[in-house]
Amino acid sequence: RDLVRSRGLGDVYKRQISDSGKELSRLIQQEAVYIGKAMDELETFRQKPAALRGYCNKLHDIENQADDVYEHFITKLFEEEKDCIELIKIKEIMHELEKTTDVAEQVGKILKNLIIKYA
């Protein structure tokens, strides 16, 4: 902390996390929980594929929610942010969060393929 203050970097950390950023983070946490639950189902998915399929569907639904949050945020960002450098930084951070939800959905697609192949 003293190093940050002594180098005048304190302003770097003054930006508040947007509600959209918090919402994307919350959605990512939900996806992580569902991926964990899906992994627990892998041992028995041949006997009861519906449980695993349900988690895959939840991952898909959450990713769609994340797309909506991201698109709304980006629209608002381009309308309100006047500093081009800040706009680019914030956009990239939010894009990385949104990409994380895409990857979680991809996990769900892979698991659905396992159901089709082995159930």
Explain the meaning of each model-derived region.
Residues 2-13:
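Single conserved hydrophobic/aromatic residue that forms the stacking wall/gate
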Residues 8-10, 21, 36, 54, ...:
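Residue-identity detector for glycine
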Residues 12, 17-23, 50, 114-119:
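A broadly tuned preference for mixed-charge, low-complexity surface segments
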Residues 14-46:
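Long, non-coiled-coil amphipathic alpha-helical linker/lever segments
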Residues 44-119:
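Long amphipathic all-alpha helical oligomerization modules
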